[in-house]
């Protein structure tokens, strides 16, 4: 799981550099190598999650057309799946339909809340969205405690703007962020959202954050 986190984090960094330095021209070999290795460690999440984060980031930039974004994600995805596909085909030939059923159940069954009769072991904690935030809060102890104590020092003032104006101002501030900060924020939100979808999860899935 630490290995998966390493490949995803470095892969995200390479995706960011691809846009920042090359403006999506060509696909650096490091991207398919890193994402491919991420797939081999933990399954399709190694490609889906980084490209999901990167796609949202590109949309937030409003610098490229939808077609350019789609082509960039498609090229990165196809090139990244080549290496894992060789391993999956070899494993399928060795394990047959049993391997295929278990692989589909582990990677897609719990994500789409489907029944997984071929799995006879625990896939993780079946808790609500709150579990992700509780795990993150526990992981940042003691800083979480200091954060909650600091809330008592806040001075609240009656807002001079309407809720709509506040939301619009917040959105504009996000859009005007430096690219590094915007990418970090998008990654944070997308990863939390992504891991809130599966019907079961485990605490180490938050290592990417």
Annotate each predicted stretch with a short phrase.
Residues 205-209:
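Conserved small/polar residues in nucleotide/adenosyl-binding loops
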Residues 17-21, 38, 138:
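Generic secondary-structure signature for well-ordered alpha-helical cores
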Residues 7-14, 55:
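Alpha-helical transmembrane segments of multi-pass inner-membrane proteins
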Residues 34, 41, 46-202:
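Transmembrane-lumen/periplasm boundary regions of multi-pass, lipid-linked membrane glycan transferases
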Residues 1-10, 25, 41-47:
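Multi-pass, polyprenyl lipid-linked donor-dependent membrane glycosyltransferases
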Residues 3, 7, 21-22, 121, ...:
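Pocket-edge positions in alpha/beta enzyme catalytic cores
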Residues 11-27:
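Membrane-interface transmembrane helices that cradle and orient dolichyl/undecaprenyl
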Residues 29-33:
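The feature captures the transmembrane alpha-helix scaffold of multi-pass secondary transporters
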């Amino acid at each position: 799981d630490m290995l998966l986190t390493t490949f995803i984090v470095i892969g995200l960094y390479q995706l960011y550099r691809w846009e920042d330095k090359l403006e999506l021209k060509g696909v650096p070999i490091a991207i398919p190598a890193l994402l491919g290795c991420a797939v081999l460690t933990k399954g399709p999440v190694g490609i889906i999650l980084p490209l999901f984060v990167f796609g949202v980031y590109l949309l937030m930039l409003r610098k490229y057309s939808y077609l350019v974004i789609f082509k960039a994600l498609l090229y990165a995805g196809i090139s990244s799946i080549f290496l894992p596909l060789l391993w999956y085909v070899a494993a399928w030939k060795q394990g047959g339909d049993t391997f295929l059923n278990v692989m589909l159940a582990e990677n897609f069954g719990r994500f789409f809340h489907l029944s997984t009769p071929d799995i006879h072991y625990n896939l993780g904690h079946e808790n609500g969205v709150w579990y992700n935030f509780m795990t993150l809060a526990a992981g940042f102890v003691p800083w979480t405690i200091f954060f909650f104590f600091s809330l008592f020092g806040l001075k609240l003032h009656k807002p001079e703007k309407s809720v709509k104006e506040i939301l619009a101002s917040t959105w504009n501030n996000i859009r005007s962020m430096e690219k590094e900060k915007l990418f970090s924020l998008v990654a944070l939100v997308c990863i939390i959202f992504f891991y809130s979808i599966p019907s079961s999860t485990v605490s180490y899935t938050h290592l990417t954050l």
